[in-house]
Structure formats: C-alpha cells, structure tokens
Amino acid sequence: VANHRKRGRSATVVVVGATAGMTAILTFGQFADALAATLPGSDAVVGVGGKDDTLGERIPNKFGGNYVPYGGEFVEPAADRYYPVHYSATLPIDSSVADGRQPLIDQVGIARTQIGPNGTVYIVGYSEGSLVAENYKREINAGTVDPGGNVEFVYIAAPTVPNGGIYARFPNMGPLGLLGFTSTGAAEPSPYAETFITVEYDPIGDFPAYANPLSLANAAAGFLYLHGDPTPDATDLNDPDAVIVKTVGNDTYILVKTEHLPLLQPIRDVSTAINTTAFTEPVLGAIEPTLKLAVDMGYTDRDYSDPATPTRFSLITPPKRIAETLNQLPGALQEGADNFTGGSPATAPPPTTVSPTTLAPTDRIAGKKQAPKVVATNDEVDTPKKPVKRPPVQRRDNVRDAMSDVARNVRDTFKPKPKSGPDAAPKHRAKPQRASDGDKAA
C-alpha cells in the first residue's frame, strides 16, 4: 500500500511538473510573439487618417493593427507610442490637406520629444492622409521643416503611387482643381524609406493605365467596393497569401491582390440576396478568368514589375500588351471551363489577403500557386439560407463541353503550324496552359 501511494504521488508530481512546463513554454512563446509583433519603444507612429477620420482613430485598425514595416515583418506600435493627427479630413481635399500640415508637424515634434533623436518616427497616412504625409515629406526635402531625426513613411491607398496612383496617371491636371482636387503628380523621391500599400483595383492607388472601357468600369466598381476605409482592416500583411512586393531603392511597393473583380460584385450581391448563388457562381467562375484578362489589359502589368516609374494615362493600349493578353486567352478559357465544373461559391465583397514581406532590396512574388483564401465577413452572406436546386446535370455538362471545345479551338488557332516535309518535327498535342499567378483572379 505504501509503495502504491508513493507511485501515485510520483505520478502526480510528474503530471503537475509537465503541465507547469508546458504552460511556461506556451506563455513564454506568446510573450515572445507579442514582443516580436510590437515596435520598439524607441520608435513611434504618427497617423493621419483618411476622409472623415478627423482624429486619426482608424489608422491603428489597418491590417489587423500590424501596419508598420519593421525587422522584415509588419508590427504594431507600442500602446503609448501612437500619435494621431487631428485635422478636418473632409472635402474639398486641397483645403483639408493644407489644414493637416501644422497638426502633423506638431505631432512629429511631440513624438520626437518622447523617443529622442535616435528613434524613428513612422508617418502613416491613409488615402487623403497620405497626401498630408506626402506634402510633409516634400517640405523636408525642401528644407522648410526638420523632423529632428530619422523618419519613415507608410502610404496606404495613396493616389501618388508612381505607376497606378490616380494623381500619377493625371499629373497637374487643371480641371481637378475646379472640384477641389489638384493633382500633385507621383510621389517625390526621398532619402527616407517609404512603403506604398495598395489594394488591387482600388482606383485611387491602382488606376488603369490605358483607356480600356472594361478596366475603367471595373475601377469605378473598385472605388465603391475597395476604397472604403475599413477595407484593409481584415487583412494580415504577415499572412502568406496573395501579395506582390517590389523593392526599388529605399521604397517598397506592395500590391494586395483581390479575390474577385469588383465589376462582378453587384451580380454576386443580388445573387446572395435572392439565394441563387449555387446557380450563378459556376457561371461567374466560367466568365471571370477571361473577363479579368480583358480588364488587366488596361494596366501596364499585373506583376508589379515596374511600380516606381511614373506612368501617365494613355488613350492607346500598346500592341505588345494586346498580344500578351491574346497569348493568355486559351488558358483563361480553360480555367473558366474548370471553374464551371467546380463552381465554388464566393459571395462576399472582393476580399483582400496578403503575405509576409521581407523588406530587402530584392523582388519577390508570393510563392503560393493557388488563389488566396477568402476572408469571410458574414457566414449568413456566404451560405444560402435555403437549398437551391442546381440546373440538370446534362444541361451543365453540355455547356461545359461547349466551353471546352471553344477553349481547344482558340488554343489550336494560336499554335504554330507544323513544318511540312521530311524535316518536320513529330506532331504532338500541347497541354492546356493555365494563366499565371499574376493573371489569375486572386
């Protein structure tokens, strides 16, 4: 009996010790993660909100709170190291941006006093607030203001992105001034590090480069669905999904890929409202890859290969861009046929997801070869409340076969004709090519 009690006590000690050890490991791990996700106390963030964010209260919500590039990832500032800028944040933009000048200078001075001359002040601006930050940077370049030490800039949804921002597309355009919008052109080069974060198809930072009607219509829908202040809040810049990163000198450009074209979102909204998603989604999935090709033809590229070159809007689409699109058409048609067979529902507004970024002077495109996961915002929206009958299997198979035939015919049209004669290469059938990651709807 005594031995049995000793063994019982020993087992209890082992269990308690193991539990305590695991608890300590988990606690320490969470503590370490918390430290890794927080900007050092020697640095500070000054935030300038977008329209109607007069107190800069929404900046800390961006990208789940981790919106400051530090140590190869995105982190949040320490709780007592965020300094919001108070300004009118309204329309017309020109007078509102001018109103934010002095409050920004004051807040940078306060932050500098708190962290000292050796710390870094990160100036983060969203949309209209990014213009306030851009003007402040230009004053630093001109020597009219002194930040008192190192500063870095983070521009979210900025119209000054060199290749994509609407101000860069239409530099010094006079008529905009009549509406209170005076284009100041692309962001001015600076010796300070800058990070531009843009949501794909948001026309403020990702406006079409060419007069493509489909691209312009999609951009208009993108303004309604993607430019709203809460859009970036649910995404995580440290989540390995669809994001494209390009580093040029001191500047880092990030394009957050969208799941679906904003142009098709009204149809998805109506489909959700009347519980017909199970029918409409296979059809939308069938046409979206090809429609996306047509929309993307209105941009210089979709792989962010040259985001730092200021590019004006042009009425003419270069023949090379048209040829690139035609070469990708067979793969898009095949992808559409495959989507029609699967027909996975996706009814929420175009979500955005991102992957971690390493701020090194190298180019990197997120390595995953599949579309990004959807950030669900409402389960009731994504799931029809009542079962919906699908069309007869035979009818869907007929449509699918017809689409496959079209894809095969188009693909054969673009195949080089075989040589005739004894030296001709043996005939072979090429496998259907899928659209590349940069051309898929992410």
Label for each model-derived stretch:
Residues 1-123, 134-442:
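Composition-driven, intrinsically disordered low-complexity tracts enriched in small residues
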Residues 127-130:
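Active-site loop->helix "elbow" adjoining a glycine-rich segment at hydrolase catalytic centers
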